[in-house]
Design a protein with these regions (language model features):
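Cationic, amphipathic, low-complexity segments that mediate targeting or membrane/lipid association
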Residues: 3, 23, 30-33
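Cysteine-centered motifs
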Residues: 34, 55-57
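Hydrophobic, low-acid, alpha-helix-prone terminal segments
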Residues: 4-12
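Hydrophobic structural segments
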Residues: 57-334
Length: 334
């Protein structure tokens, strides 16, 4: 069988080094031939050995205009990188593909905050093909994959069920329209800009902006609690302090305390803030609102799922996106 291919550069989706990715398409006359010859996994492996090359094709699921296309893990990674470019990730981070292969087909996607054992098991039971999480499954280098450990069991289950796992971590935190922007918008901040910026590298971690009108700190805290759907939060500062400008950082924001103190914001909203951070803010006449790590980041699940649905539909792929609805904050308040 002879297949003719044409390459079309997708300039909107660069890879890590900024080089445009190529999207390989089969010319019209050969589409039906390629569709009839799609190999299963074993035949694909044999083809690799026999021909010393492997080609992944995204072809329409049926001939004719307007038909949806089958998606692969690689296709979804390209979509995720338009939302949260990989090059934005911090050097210490391990965002990207955690388990699986780019050529694996994807018909169902799960979105979750954490790759916890119960999340991975549920995704497998629901026949998901791709699990997209904020926090990486493999954060530190693994010396071995031991199925007697929690992470080993998750890797084993994912591979056994052919569930790919992809993380969008600090790149989603930093990206424009990403997690920090989502948090700032949710609590009502306007005129949003970067809190910890680097020249030529986008807005960086954290955001800062204005409230529509000044409010008392106690009223701001109650507003945040309501808008974020929280049972509780921690507040530092004079409850009557007038707040007109607010800084935020999702997750653990302690590393941005210096940027907060250097700014003109009266309050800083984040999670995992420490005792001495609280004392420093108290002494400086500033305010802290600690909404917890989970509380500041869980909103990414619904938001990212919706972005994925929009991009999948826009590109003509056929893949369902579901949100994991069972996650809970690991901290319990008595």
């Amino acid at each position: 069988m002879i297949m003719r291919f044409t390459a079309a550069a997708n300039a909107a989706s660069p890879n890590r080094k900024g080089t445009p990715r190529n999207e390989w398409k089969i010319s019209g006359a050969d589409q039906s031939t390629c569709q009839k010859a799609k190999p299963d996994r074993e035949r694909a492996s044999k083809a690799w050995a026999d021909h010393a090359f492997f080609c992944v094709c995204s072809t329409p699921s049926a001939s004719g205009a307007g038909q949806e296309m089958n998606a692969t893990v690689g296709d979804l990674i390209q979509i995720l990188e338009t939302i949260a470019p990989a090059e934005l990730a911090e050097e210490w981070d391990n965002s990207g593909l955690q388990v699986g292969a780019r050529h694996w087909p994807v018909k169902k996607i799960w979105v979750a905050l954490d790759p916890q054992p119960e999340v991975v098991v549920s995704a497998c039971r629901q026949n998901a093909d791709l699990l997209v999480t904020h926090h990486p499954l493999i954060f530190r280098p693994l010396r071995r994959v031991d199925a007697a450990t929690p992470i080993g069991r998750m890797v084993e289950a994912a591979l056994a069920h052919k569930l790919a796992v992809v993380a969008v971590h600090t790149n989603l935190d930093i990206a424009r329209g990403g997690l920090n922007d989502l948090l700032a918008e949710r609590i009502g901040i306007e005129n949003i800009s970067g809190l910890d910026t680097f020249a030529g590298q986008g807005p960086g971690l954290g955001r800062i902006g204005d409230l529509p009108q000044p409010v008392r700190l106690s009223d701001l805290a109650r507003q945040i609690k309501e808008r974020m759907g929280l049972f509780t939060l921690r507040m530092v500062g004079d409850p009557s302090l007038a707040v007109s400008r607010v800084a935020v950082c999702t997750g653990s924001g302690g590393s941005l305390m210096g940027a907060f103190f250097a700014s003109d914001a009266q309050a800083f909203v984040s999670g995992d803030l420490r005792y001495h951070d609280a004392r420093d803010a108290e002494n400086a006449g500033r305010a802290l609102v600690d909404i917890g790590h989970f509380g500041s980041e869980h909103l990414m699940v619904g938001a990212l799922a919706e972005r994925l649905r929009e991009e999948i539909e826009r590109r003509g792929f056929s893949a369902a996106v579901e949100e994991c609805r069972t996650e809970q904050d690991p901290f319990r308040r008595l």
